[in-house]
UniProtKB/Swiss-Prot annotation:
Species this chain originates from: Bradyrhizobium sp. (strain BTAi1 / ATCC BAA-1182)
The keyword Transmembrane helix is annotated on this UniProt entry: no
InterPro entries documented for this protein: PsdUridine_synth_cat_dom_sf, PsdUridine_synth_TruA, PsdUridine_synth_TruA_a/b_dom, PsdUridine_synth_TruA_C, TruA/RsuA/RluB/E/F_N
Family membership: Belongs to the tRNA pseudouridine synthase TruA family.
Gene Ontology MF terms: RNA binding; tRNA pseudouridine(38-40) synthase activity
Name used for this protein in its record: tRNA pseudouridine synthase A
Catalytically driven reaction(s): uridine(38/39/40) in tRNA = pseudouridine(38/39/40) in tRNA
Keywords from the UniProt entry: Isomerase, tRNA processing
Amino acid sequence: MPRYKLTIEYDGTPFCGWQLQETLPSVQGALEAAVQATCGVPTRVHGSGRTDAGVHATGQVAHCDIAKDFRPDKLRDALNAHLRPNPVAVLEAEIVSDTFEARFSARKRHYRYRIVNRRSNLALEVGRVWRVPQRLDSDAMHAAAQRLIGRHDFTTFRDTECQAKSPEKTLDQLDVVRDGDAVTILTSARSYLHSQVRSMVGSLVWVGQGRWSADDLAAALAARNRAACGVVAPPEGLYLVKVDY
């Protein structure tokens, strides 16, 4: 039974998140329905991580074992045909070793958070970005972000319902770049706590607005207390863009 690695993009807006839910639409559920329609038997699809409701992906990775040999391009096309009209697309399918695990084989996960920093309303990107009307000091945000790089106890920046055994994570990258009215936060790490990226982004926005200094951000991290976190950024600006193996 061959194992296939799938690279997937999706608009998270209509979904309750990646994880299968019995009564709610999920990305995992849409993919498993497409696989069953393609191969004729129920098949579990395992993702590299569970994105929250409203979070998007341009490079999510999953694997599944299919009881039928498909040429990878034929499987990709068949899955895409059965995925319609869901806003989910399989970009690539490839046969991999049966030891490959989308979640546990991952070495690094890359996320992008998109902010549009302008007073005018959004006309074209509603549900795709976070509009912040107050002018943000992106240089101050970037400088403060470097205080979070490295291995830390990120309790302040994790959801109270996070089920991770340890609050310690190693953050490899957290950059803030501006291009016109677009402010983008780029982050990479092997793994994250629940809501960690959105919590860090929201706190950095407070820095950009002048509500916090870099020292305030560092103090929030050191507090190891969820109550010390700034605002949590909304899900619509967050994208899982790549997973390294």
